[in-house]
Every structure is written in C-alpha cells, then in structure tokens.
UniProtKB/Swiss-Prot annotation:
UniProt name for this protein: UDP-N-acetylglucosamine--N-acetylmuramyl-(pentapeptide) pyrophosphoryl-undecaprenol N-acetylglucosamine transferase
EC code: 2.4.1.227
NCBIfam families: murG
Keyword hit for Cell inner membrane: yes
Length: 372
C-alpha cells in the first residue's frame, strides 16, 4: 500500500502565481487522489481567497515584498520575514510534508528556505525567462527546477533543470466555447473583430490610462469590439470615464473576467502585460498578442519574456513608456490585418507546452515517493 503523500505548495500574490499553483495541485490529485496538499501564501493577498475557492486549505505568512525604491522602509519587511520563517517552521513541523513546491511570490521564499533547512526536498517553478533573486538562492538546495524557457542554465545548475513550461488554468482548454456564443456572453456582436485587453489580475495603470484616453477612438472604430478587464483598483475611474464618453455598444468593461475561456474564444487579438503565466496561455491558445511589459517588476523580467516571443515573430512589443502614443494604432492596425494575425497565431502556437501541470506533478510525486 502506498504511503499517503503530503505536499506543500507555496507562493502567490497575483493570479500569475496562483492559477499555475492550483493547476499543479489539481494534476497531483488526478495522479494521486490520496495526496494531502497544503498551500502556504501571504496574509492579505489574493491567494487567501482564490485557493480556498479552488478547494484547498491555505495558511498565510505575515510576509511582504521588499521596497526597492525606498530601502529604509524595509526594516519592517525584515521583521516580517523573520516572523514568516518562524511560522513556516511551525507549519512544516506540524504538516510533515515529503516535498515543498515554490511557484513564486512573497511566501515561497521563507517557506522553501525553511523546508530546505529542515531536510524537506524542494522543487521550484521558475515561470520567467529571467530568474528572480529568490529562485536563484533557493536553487542551491532545490532537488528540481521546472522552467519554461530555453537557456535557463545560465541561472541554475543544468542537472536540476526540467523543461516543463508553465501550467495554465485547466478550464481554458476544457471549456472553450464557440466564438459567437462567447461574444454574445459579453453582449457583443458575433460578426465583428474583437480585441481583449487585460492587465493581469490586479490591473495595469498604463494600459488603462491608454484605453481611457482612447475612448473617442473606440467610439469611432465601431466595427471593432473591445473586452476590457481593468482590475479592481482601476474599475471605478474607468467606468466613470466610459459613462462620460456616452454610448459605446462596441465596448464591454469589467473589473475581473471570471470566464477567461470565453474571453479568449471571443477575441481576435489580445493586449496584455507580459507575465509568464499569461504568455503560456497565449501560446497554448494560439492567440495573437500585443505585449506591453510592466516596468515595475524585478529584473525587468516582463520585457525579457516579451522579447523571447518577439525574437520568434510570435508577438508584438510596445514599450510601457510609449503605450499612450502607440498602443491603439498598433492594435487597430494589427487586428485589421488578417495575414499578420495568422502569422502571429502560427508562430506563438509553436512555443506551446500543453501538458505542463501534469509533468510538474509527476516530478513532485517522484520526489515525495523517494522520501517514503
């Protein structure tokens, strides 16, 4: 009889970390229904709601990110880090996992560092084309490092690297509706080209400001439709601007899209930040995309993610600082060019790694079973 598996998955902060983590957990349960999985996140962050919604238990750490612009503010962060490591030690001691998995985000650092110090095997998932400081440090003790881009041996020991790709939300491929039905679910016409605008689960200031400034252009181009996810922080000001602009039947605005399968099915082109999780979804679904990387991320990794696609003619890149001047023209010209859309779709499809969650789950189970 197989011994029960006990696995910790740690990370979060944004949907880009949470959705892959849940996909890995689901894949583990599919392979080993007896497995017990405990998530460790950051108190007050998105994962504390989204993980229980997915059916898993989560414990929060009192962790916060470093302020890279105001170093003097990090005294309290260091105190929270020490408290988080102490709490992580208690969690690991009580739960007794055979393996700890880090998916990125505030909580993964103290959790995996503590797990390694306590002799628990660790696996890290590096989503980006440029490894972050935390994962480079955690890699020293990690048993396996799952990556999504070639050339990651410049950051990690080559013998630990496993090319898996990034897991995506599982309902994207299982529940993809027909395009006309998807458009009708957003109160849009089934026979018009449609652009989907997303800025990540928290929203993107530059993209929202650009679209807000372009409401007159959106009204003029009523042969093109727009599905716009603003993020919860920007939703009130965006909806106020939309109301002031008058009737816009070709525009659907929401703070958060729950059914992303429908949003992708409805769209001919996507405007997005360049988070690794989002890019993996675009690859899997063959979606033409205009990427506007966030400049406010560690090591400018989103720009590096975007350029990895641009080098393969698999995406269009607009700098954040140039978005307000260029983004709408680029998007409108691209969505009107069927040949360009086809080229982008074919090239991004070549980069897809469709079974990522299952491959990572198999590696996690292998490590856990080796401990039994």
């Amino acid at each position: 009889m197989e011994k029960e598996l006990r696995i910790i998955i740690s990370g979060g902060g944004t949907g880009g970390h949470i959705f892959p983590a849940v996909s890995i957990a689901n894949a583990i349960i599919e392979l080993r229904p007896d497995a017990k999985i405990l998530f460790v996140g950051a108190e007050g962050r998105m994962e504390m709601q989204r993980v229980p919604d997915a059916g898993y238990k989560i414990i929060g750490l009192p962790i916060a990110g470093f302020d890279r612009k105001h170093l003097w503010k990090n005294v309290s962060v260091l105190i929270k880090l020490a408290r988080s490591q102490w709490k992580a030690r208690s969690i690991i001691k009580n739960f007794r996992p055979q393996v700890a998995v880090g998916v990125g985000g505030y909580a993964s650092g103290p959790t995996l560092k503590t797990a390694g110090m306590m002799g628990v095997p660790t696996l890290i998932q590096e989503q980006n084309s440029y490894a972050g400081v935390t994962n480079k440090l955690l890699a020293q003790k990690a048993k396996a490092i799952c990556v999504a881009y070639d050339g990651m041996e410049k950051f990690f020991p080559a013998d630990k690297i496993i090319m898996t790709g990034n897991p995506v939300r599982q309902n994207l491929t299982k529940d993809m509706p027909e395009k006309g039905a998807a458009l009708r679910s957003f109160n849009l016409q089934p026979d018009k080209k449609t652009i989907l605008i997303v800025g990540g689960s928290l929203g993107a200031r530059t993209i929202n400001n650009t679209l807000t400034a372009a409401l007159a252009t959106i009204k003029e181009n009523n042969d093109i439709q727009f599905i716009w996810q603003t993020g919860k922080y920007y939703y009130p000001q965006v909806t106020e601007a939309v109301r002031a602009a008058g009737e816009l039947p070709n525009l659907y605005v929401t703070d958060f899209i729950k059914d992303m399968a429908a949003a992708y099915a409805a769209s001919d082109l996507v405007i997005s930040r360049a988070g690794a999780g989002s890019i993996s979804e675009f690859c899997l679904l063959h979606k033409p995309v205009v990427l506007v990387p966030s400049p406010n991320v560690a090591e400018d990794h989103q720009t590096k993610n975007a350029l990895a696609l641009v080098d393969k003619q698999a995406a269009i890149y607009v700098k954040d600082s140039e978005a307000e001047a260029k983004l709408m023209d680029v998007a409108l010209n691209t969505v009107a060019d069927d040949r360009k859309l086809k080229e982008l779709s074919e090239n991004i499809a070549k980069l897809a790694l469709p079974d990522s969650a299952r491959i990572i789950a198999q590696e996690v189970i292998k490590l856990a079973e080796a401990e039994n």
